[in-house]
Amino acid sequence: MRPAGRSANQVRPVTLTRNYTKHAEGSVLVEFGDTKVLCTASIEEGVPRFLKGQGQGWITAEYGMLPRATHTRNAREAAKGKQGGRTMEIQRLIARALRAAVDLKTLGEFTITLDCDVVQADGGTRTASITGACVALADALNKLVANGKLKTNPMKGMVAAVSVGIVNGEAICDLEYVEDSAAETDMNVVMTEDGRIIEVQGTAEGEPFSHEELLTLLALARGGIESIVATQKAALEN
């Protein structure tokens, strides 16, 4: 029995609250159960130096956790004077995932920065960040079109992510913290809305997993992501 009584393939309740802050071109509070992340999308004219004159845009991301997002307080990374390796890995993952959702040539010479700040962590903060940031990105791109700065919306489709893993020998979807900390295998999967894989991050924390178990986990992830994408689309229609 899972802690919340969920079935193996069931994701936590997912809530996407749009326009959560007033200044950013796109802002979403995403909730996966007790995990809560504020995702904002900010638009700037111009692109990084390595892209100048190429007629395409860029999407980048930053990720951070509030000091008391976890059980015990973690000092802000700014106070330490540098970002940790985990932070850099996650923000690069978010950026890669969201670049897959956009035609960068159609975006033109704009840079969109996605800021994902974890308010409360209970497992799956990176997958929640990708899911919420995609909706914030969609809102920002819609504003570029509405303001006449783009003729065509460069959004190719939704992107979402979910964690899967093996806990006590059972493959499960969308791990909360107590499950994640006990997992024999932990995996994060990012997919497009039509089920194509953008990224798979998988590690055997204890017992190595088989090829068959890998396929089972990917199938679980696809089912979970289909449910999450439906929630994303419903949020954008409201």
From Swiss-Prot:
Keywords: Nucleotidyltransferase, RNA-binding, rRNA processing, Transferase, tRNA processing, tRNA-binding
Cross-referenced InterPro entries: ExoRNase_PH_dom1, ExoRNase_PH_dom2, ExoRNase_PH_dom2_sf, PNPase/RNase_PH_dom_sf, Ribosomal_Su5_D2-typ_SF, RNase_PH, RNase_PH_bac-type, RNase_PH_CS
Binding site for phosphate: R86, G124, T125, R126
Top-rank EC class of the record's enzyme: transferase
Enzyme Commission no: 2.7.7.56
Role played: Phosphorolytic 3'-5' exoribonuclease that plays an important role in tRNA 3'-end maturation. Removes nucleotide residues following the 3'-CCA terminus of tRNAs; can also add nucleotides to the ends of RNA molecules by using nucleoside diphosphates as substrates, but this may not be physiologically important. Probably plays a role in initiation of 16S rRNA degradation (leading to ribosome degradation) during starvation.
Protein name: Ribonuclease PH
Species for this entry: Salmonella choleraesuis (strain SC-B67)
Gene: rph
